A protein has these predicted regions:
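Core catalytic alpha/beta fold that binds nucleotide/phospho-ligands
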Residues: 1-161
Length: 161
C-alpha cells in the first residue's frame, strides 16, 4: 500500500493525490482544488500539464487515413474549409487543439464537438471562448496542443511510455 506524503513539523498536512472524476469524466484532485491537470497519450509518448486554473492538453500521433473520416463527422465547417487548403499535419494540429479545449472545459467529445472552431480563416485559432490555445513544438510526427485561461501559468511534462 502506498504511504501518504509526510509534512514537515509545524506545516499543514501534505495533500493527497487521490483523484475523482467530474460529471463528464474529467479527473481532478479533490484534496487540492488549487491544482488542475490534464493528461494525454498517443503513440509512444505521454504528456501532463499542471496549472493553478483549468487546463487541457492533447497529444496526437500523425497517423494515416483519419483526416476525412474524422473531419466530416466532428469538425466545424470553418475547420473543414481551412483544412482543404492545408497540409495533412494541420489536421492533427486542429484535432489536438479541439481536444485540448474540451479537456479544458471538461465537456469531452460529444455532439457539440462540431459547434466550435479551432481554426481561424487562414490559421489555427489562438483562442476559443476566451481560453488561449497554443500548439507546442514537440516531435515532427506529433501534434501537442495546450488550452488554458493563461498559457504562461502552465507546466508541461512529457516522456516516452
Amino acid at each position: 500500500m502506498p504511504s501518504q506524503p509526510k509534512s514537515a513539523p509545524g506545516q499543514p498536512p501534505a495533500p493527497s493525490w487521490r483523484t475523482q472524476k467530474g460529471s463528464h469524466g474529467k479527473p481532478y484532485f479533490p484534496d487540492c482544488p488549487w491544482l488542475h491537470f490534464s493528461i494525454s497519450h498517443s503513440g509512444e509518448y505521454w504528456a501532463c500539464a499542471m496549472a493553478p486554473t483549468e487546463v487541457g492538453l492533447d497529444l496526437q500521433l500523425h497517423t494515416k487515413g483519419r483526416k476525412e473520416r474524422i473531419s466530416s463527422r466532428f469538425f466545424h465547417p470553418q475547420e473543414n474549409e481551412y483544412l482543404r487548403r492545408c497540409a495533412y499535419r494541420d489536421f492533427f494540429d486542429i484535432w489536438a487543439a479541439k481536444e485540448s479545449y474540451v479537456k479544458y472545459t471538461g465537456q469531452g467529445i460529444d455532439e457539440n464537438f462540431a459547434s466550435f472552431t479551432a481554426a481561424a480563416p487562414t490559421a489555427p485559432a489562438a483562442e476559443i471562448n476566451g481560453a488561449q490555445l497554443k500548439s507546442i513544438p514537440f516531435h515532427p510526427d506529433y501534434s501537442l496542443s495546450l488550452c488554458a485561461p493563461r498559457i504562461d501559468n502552465v507546466i508541461i511534462h512529457y516522456e516516452t511510455q
